[in-house]
């Protein structure tokens, strides 16, 4: 009876969603709605930073290590130890606090093997870290950890724990089935890119808005994305200065043309009067400048010059005749 009660306690302890609690406490977010939508330490580190991720990793490991350590202190049965470890793992995978959903049980796996087989766990952990460092895929490193664990247990002489390690390997592979599919298709993102995308989450969310603003440059924003008539270009609603000037000139052109036609008609109607008026003034000046001046300038000077020449000639001839008679 006491053993069953302890298994229930181990399950409840494993069900505590430290990742969800810390994410809401330190960064006000729900890891189930961001990143990989998982409450595990890896996703919490993406969303809230490395410190919160490490804190989640430690607590998830402790909720597996503490129940197993207590089981070791109260019983020598390897079966009981293994069942306690499985209860804590199932609590993390299918949490009673999260509608029987949970994480991927990697940190809790580390916790349950920590008091059971320390050195095999260390060797498996080194292999895990080496794979993560070389490939950048945390999921691949986690799969390496649980795959290497049975072999390390055999090498370390912990053959009684091999069945537990095999069951844990199946559970962890099942929880990583989506990651395995992405790895096989080459679609899994390495840790560095995931961490960068999570850190730039705000900018990535603003990028589409900036693109939408750039796409709607020169438009009127109605506050919606409906593509309604309010998103017509502002050039249609408010014409530019050039178009307004062109329209103003276009409106003035017919008026100027009409005024030009009126002026031409008036000039055409007044043409006979203008010609008659011009002919009369021309006759009078012509009579004055041609008739009278011509008679004065021609007749009078001619008579004067003729009189002078005639008088001089008569005087000369009279003088000559006087001289001849005197002789």
From Swiss-Prot:
Region annotation Disordered: where it falls in the sequence: 184-212, 233-327
Biased composition (Low complexity): 199-212
Superkingdom of origin organism: Bacteria
Molecular-function GO terms, alphabetical: acyl-phosphate glycerol-3-phosphate acyltransferase activity
GO biological process: phospholipid biosynthetic process
Biased composition, class Polar residues, residue ranges: 237-246
Catalytic activity: an acyl phosphate + sn-glycerol 3-phosphate = a 1-acyl-sn-glycero-3-phosphate + phosphate
Transmembrane segments: 3-23, 52-72, 78-98, 112-132, 152-172
Pathway this chain belongs to: Lipid metabolism; phospholipid metabolism
Main location: membrane
Topology of the protein relative to the lipid bilayer: Multi-pass membrane protein
Enzyme Commission identifier(s): 2.3.1.275
Disulfide bonds: none
Any Pfam family hit: G3P_acyltransf
GO cellular component: plasma membrane
Ranges annotated as biased composition (Basic and acidic residues): 259-271
Role noted for this protein: Catalyzes the transfer of an acyl group from acyl-phosphate (acyl-PO(4)) to glycerol-3-phosphate (G3P) to form lysophosphatidic acid (LPA). This enzyme utilizes acyl-phosphate as fatty acyl donor, but not acyl-CoA or acyl-ACP.
Family according to the record: Belongs to the PlsY family.
Protein name per UniProt: Glycerol-3-phosphate acyltransferase
Originating species: Nitratidesulfovibrio vulgaris (strain ATCC 29579 / DSM 644 / CCUG 34227 / NCIMB 8303 / VKM B-1760 / Hildenborough)
Originating gene: plsY
């Amino acid at each position: 009876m006491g053993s069953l009660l302890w298994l229930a306690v181990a399950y409840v302890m494993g069900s505590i969603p430290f990742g969800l609690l810390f994410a809401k406490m330190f960064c006000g977010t729900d890891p189930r709605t961001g990143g990989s939508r998982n409450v595990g330490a890896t996703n919490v580190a993406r969303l809230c930073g490395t410190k919160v991720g490490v804190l989640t990793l430690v607590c998830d490991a402790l909720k597996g290590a503490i129940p197993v350590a207590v089981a070791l202190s109260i019983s020598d049965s390897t079966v009981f130890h293994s069942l306690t470890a499985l209860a804590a793992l199932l609590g993390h995978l299918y949490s009673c606090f999260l509608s029987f959903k949970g994480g991927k049980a990697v940190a809790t796996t580390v916790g349950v093997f920590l008091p059971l087989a320390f050195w095999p766990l260390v060797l498996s952990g080194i292999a895990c870290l080496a794979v993560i460092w070389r490939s950048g895929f945390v999921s691949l490193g986690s799969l390496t950890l649980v795959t290497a664990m049975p072999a390390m247990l055999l090498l370390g002489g912990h053959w009684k724990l091999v069945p537990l390690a095999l069951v844990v390997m199946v559970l962890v592979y099942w929880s990583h089935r989506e990651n395995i599919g992405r790895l096989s298709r080459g679609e899994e993102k390495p840790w560095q890119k995931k961490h960068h995308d999570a850190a730039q989450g705000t900018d990535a969310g603003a990028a589409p808005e900036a693109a939408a603003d750039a796409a709607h440059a020169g438009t009127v924003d109605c506050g919606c994305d409906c593509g309604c008539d309010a998103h017509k270009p502002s050039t249609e609603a408010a014409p530019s200065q050039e178009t307004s000037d062109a329209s103003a000139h276009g409106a003035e052109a017919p008026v100027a043309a009409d005024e030009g036609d009126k002026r031409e008609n008036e000039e055409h109607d007044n043409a006979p009067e203008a010609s008659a008026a011009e002919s009369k003034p021309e006759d009078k000046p012509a009579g004055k400048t041609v008739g009278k001046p011509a008679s004065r300038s021609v007749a009078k000077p001619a008579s004067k010059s003729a009189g002078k020449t005639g008088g001089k000639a008569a005087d000369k001839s009279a003088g000559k005749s006087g001289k001849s008679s005197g002789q």
